[in-house]
Amino acid sequence: MPQNERTYIAIDLKSYYASVECMERGLDPMQTNLVVADPSRTEKTICLAVSPALKAYGIPGRARLFEVVERVRQVNAERQRRAPDGRLTGRSADDLALKADASLAVDYLVAPPRMAKYIEVSMQIYGIYLKYVSPEDIHTYSIDEVLMDVTGYLETYRTTARELARAMILDVLHTTGITATAGIGSNLYLCKVAMDMMAKRVPPDENGVRIAQLDERSYRALLWEHRPLTDFWRVGRGYAKKLEEHGLYTMGDVARCSIGKPNEYYNEGLLYKLFGVNAELLIDHAWGWEPCRMADIKAYRPETNSISSGQVLQCPYPYDKARLVVREMAEAVALELLEKRIVTDQLTLTVGYDIENTASGSYRGETVLDPYGRKIPKHAHGTSTLGQKTSSVRRIVDAVLGIYDEKADPKLTVRRLTVTANRLMREEDILCEPEQPVQFSLFDDPAARERQLRQEEAKQKRERRIQEAMLGIKKKFGKNAILKGMNLEEGATARERNKTIGGHHE
């Protein structure tokens, strides 16, 4: 292999959450009808995963539970029509049994999410990868997906990328019972596209493993005419819509546009006009190029960062009850800042309203369309900038509630809330910054002002000790070991959220 050529592998665990739940029940993940969803949240809840056997009936991986119910009802109506004597005599969630007996109705299991279990298994699988590749050459893209630079390992192991990918996948399969899909590419983009788009077309082997491979030449030959554009990594609906509005429907169209002459309509200037500096990445990907390497990912540090807490409420909340939840969320963000020893001087609140506000037709304010095309009131949004960086619960809660009181409409019911702490900085870095001067007016009493500053400093130190004590108790005995009176009020959500990971039960 030439010195500048590299080889990357992307591995995606097949229907990961569903596979974990099947294995925990001693069932075959490839042959069992199962969805991971929380039925206690009504049938509108989104399924976190759908097993491959159930997907075969035309159910998408991120369906809502009622869509699964309806599709299975349709499938069973068709099976009944074709069944002997037009009658179904039993039910089964096993795909092999359903294929062998036409008189059985399709059934499925609903497994409530268990995020702590999924994280535990994911860490176990990551440990398997480390048997083959060092952590410096692995990027964890998500809980069920990794990207690897295996360039330096192929000669060491005297193997090919395909054989190495297969060895790792089979090791995971034999250890956990979970199979996977892999993509191999000459850069990070191509290995991801090979996994996401090409591996789906490859027939599985006897273990259900699919592996696909792309280089720049094969990418252009196989995918330049592919539609829709949204199938490609990092091309969302907004990008695709803009491109299609200008007659660009494929990656081949984008590539050809990028080499158009200056006097032609289709040239790279059009792409930069549409997408700004982001056009550079789009053009690179259209040609199958990706300059970023694993070392770049490992060295990357964002210029700005933030911490946020968001939730979708179980039902529409009136103004006062939503304010209680905002207070809880602001306090949780402040405690997270303290735990991580970081501080902020800017807070943002976003309040999303429920569709019931427009259902009667009496709402006359500004509206937007939700993802389902329904009109809802435009969300409220505000930012508060503090005078200095802090992790004080008191100051953060006061600032966020101030935004809520100013921006939220008391007449509307609330469904979504997001609190974000921006412009974060580590506490130790604050010590290196010069102290901000205090400006006095002609009417200020310097001595009184000095006393006031000292009192505020003492108050902050007392609050800090209390917050540290609360964190210590929560770490030792659990997040619900210490609660405030507001957490016990009707409509409060902190107690339940403390039992979850990523919004789902542990």
Question: Which sequence ranges carry the predicted segments?
Answer:
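Gly/Gly-Pro- and Ser/Thr-rich, intrinsically disordered tail segments characteristic of DNA damage-repair
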Residues: M1-W287, P291-M294, A447-E506
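DNA-contacting surface of Y-family translesion DNA polymerases
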Residues: A10, D231, R237-V414, P434
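Short, charged/polar surface micro-motifs in flexible loops or helix N-caps
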Residues: K14-Y16, S40-K44, Y353-T358, L424-E428
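Acidic, metal-coordinating catalytic segment for phosphate/diphosphate chemistry
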Residues: V20, R374-E506
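Generic "edge-of-domain/loop-turn" microfeature
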Residues: R41, E155, Y189, V312, ...
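A glycine-rich phosphate-binding loop feature that marks nucleotide/adenosyl-phosphate handling sites
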Residues: S186-Y189, D284-A286, V343-I355, T413-M425, ...
